[in-house]
Amino acid sequence: MERLLIVNADDFGLSKGQNYGIIEACRNGIVTSTTALVNGQAIDHAVQLSRDEPSLAIGMHFVLTMGKPLTAMPGLTRDGVLGKWIWQLAEEDALPLEEITQELASQYLRFIELFGRKPTHLDSHHHVHMFPQIFPIVARFAAEQGIALRADRQMAFDLPVNLRTTQGFSSAFYGEEISESLFLQVLDDAGHRGDRSLEVMCHPAFIDNTIRQSAYCFPRLTELDVLTSASLKGAIAQRGYRLGSYRDV
């Protein structure tokens, strides 16, 4: 039986270099899906590029760790800006869950305003939606809106009955050792688990000033090279995978 493979590029809207990399990986590679940061500095550029690439499925990359929120979040911001101190708040069980709930709804409405349609699915920047305190909020919201959600089933969360997600999710195509063999190993591992549907996360980009400031910089360019490799699409098909998006889940 044919298996579904979703290759999702995170960070659409982060920068122009990121946006161009994602479009290139869709147009000339195997990326089928992306998730957009509605508060990203290059989100308007991302919207513009997406109009010329209708085959690219676009979901929402919920942001709680970067930039300015769309709502007042005094319990999570410092000087009006979001940051990685959210991990400390989570450890202290001090997350402002009502503020997070309101921000999620606001980012969702902003996505629809920008792209003119609902996102195909939800995930989050730095995987914050997988925090045990936050996941029930996001899962319930996705189910209510009728959209899919990136979920790591190994986390063993209780999922809403009507929530759509893939059987498998992998973030292993990441780091300093990016290669075609690594990507194919991710598929083989999922096959051994018996996953009938799989999302693989990626971050293809061209380098610009914003990406240069990221702790994860040059591997994004290597990812782009691998994801547009002439041989990769054939190797994926040989393993019994069909490229698709969360529309197919």
UniProtKB/Swiss-Prot annotation:
What's the Enzyme Commission number for this chain?
3.5.1.105
Q: What is its main location?
A: cytoplasm
Keywords on record? Carbohydrate metabolism, Chitin degradation, Cytoplasm, Hydrolase, Magnesium, Metal-binding, Polysaccharide degradation
Q: What reactions does this protein catalyze?
A: N,N'-diacetylchitobiose + H2O = N-acetyl-beta-D-glucosaminyl-(1->4)-D-glucosamine + acetate; diacetylchitobiose-6'-phosphate + H2O = N'-monoacetylchitobiose-6'-phosphate + acetate
Question: Which InterPro entries does the entry mention?
Answer: COD_ChbG_bac, Glyco_hydro/deAcase_b/a-brl, YdjC-like
Write one Gene Ontology MF term.
Answer: chitin disaccharide deacetylase activity
One record GO biological process:
polysaccharide catabolic process
Question: Is this entry keyworded RNA-binding?
Answer: no
Q: Where are the transmembrane segments?
A: none
Task: Quote the pathway field.
Answer: Glycan degradation; chitin degradation
Pfam families this protein is in? YdjC
- Residues noted as binding Mg(2+) in the record, renumbered to the chain: H61, H125
Cofactor dependence: Mg(2+)
UniProt-annotated location(s): Cytoplasm
Stored Gene3D superfamilies:
Glycoside hydrolase/deacetylase
Q: Which domain of life is it from?
A: Bacteria
Q: What's the subunit arrangement here?
A: Homodimer.
User: Which NCBIfam families did the record assign?
Assistant: PRK02134.1
Q: What does this protein do?
A: Involved in the degradation of chitin. ChbG is essential for growth on the acetylated chitooligosaccharides chitobiose and chitotriose but is dispensable for growth on cellobiose and chitosan dimer, the deacetylated form of chitobiose. Deacetylation of chitobiose-6-P and chitotriose-6-P is necessary for both the activation of the chb promoter by the regulatory protein ChbR and the hydrolysis of phosphorylated beta-glucosides by the phospho-beta-glucosidase ChbF.
What's the protein name? Chitooligosaccharide deacetylase
Source organism (scientific name):
Escherichia coli O9:H4 (strain HS)
